[in-house]
A protein has these predicted regions:
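Residues in well-ordered beta-strands of folded domains
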Residues: 41, 85, 116
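Solvent-exposed loop/turn segments at secondary-structure junctions
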Residues: 45-46, 88-91, 118-120
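Secondary-structure boundary/capping motif
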Residues: 47-51, 93, 123
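Extracytoplasmic/secreted envelope proteins and their assembly/folding machinery
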Residues: 52, 56, 98, 132-139
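A short, hydrophobic beta-strand-centered structural micro-motif
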Residues: 68-89, 94, 100
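Amphipathic beta-strand/beta-sheet edge segments enriched in Tyr/Trp
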Residues: 93-119
Length: 150
C-alpha cells in the first residue's frame, strides 16, 4: 500500500511541477555590454497584449534603449535588430507558452534565446507567471547578463 501511495504522490508531483525550458545560443564574439540601442521588428502574428512594450521595458532594465518598428524598411538604418515570435495558450486566462528572440548585429545573428513551457504548462503553477516575468528571463539569457537597472 505504501508503494502505491508513493507512486501516486510522485505522479501528482510530476503533473503539478511541469517543466520550463530556456535555451540560449550566443556567438563567442557577442558583447552585450556594447549594446546601447536595439530596433525591434514588430511581429503582427504575435497577439499577446502589449508584447512590444514588454520587450522594450525588459531591455531598459539593462540600460538599453529600444524602439519597435512596424515597417521592415525602417530597420535598414539599424545596426542591431531583434526579431521575435511568441505564442500563447488558454486555461481560464491566456498565458505565454513559447517565445523565441533572435538578435542580429550588422545582419549577423549574435544571440538567440527561447522560452518554452513543456506541455503548455500542464498543471504547473509557474505557467501563470506574467508575460513580463517570462520575457525578462528571456532577455537576461539573450544578453548573458543580469539586469543593472530595476
Amino acid at each position: 500500500m505504501k508503494k502505491i501511495l508513493m507512486g501516486i504522490s510522485l505522479g501528482c508531483f510530476a503533473l503539478v511541477s511541469g517543466c520550463t525550458s530556456i535555451q540560449v545560443n550566443n556567438a563567442k564574439s557577442f558583447n552585450a555590454e556594447s549594446l546601447k540601442y536595439i530596433c525591434i521588428a514588430h511581429n503582427p502574428k504575435v497577439i499577446i497584449k502589449d508584447f512590444d512594450g514588454i520587450v522594450e521595458r525588459s531591455f531598459a532594465r539593462h540600460g538599453i534603449s529600444s524602439r519597435t518598428f512596424n515597417n521592415e524598411a525602417d530597420l535598414k538604418n539599424c545596426n542591431t535588430v531583434l526579431h521575435y515570435t511568441a505564442l500563447r495558450s488558454w486555461d481560464f486566462a491566456p498565458y505565454m507558452t513559447y517565445a523565441q528572440f533572435n538578435l542580429l548585429k550588422d545582419g549577423q545573428q549574435v544571440s538567440e534565446s527561447s522560452f518554452k513551457l513543456k506541455g503548455n504548462g500542464g498543471l504547473a503553477l509557474n505557467k501563470w507567471r506574467s508575460t513580463e516575468t517570462k520575457v525578462n528571463e528571456l532577455v537576461d539569457v539573450l544578453l548573458g547578463v543580469k539586469p543593472s537597472v530595476n
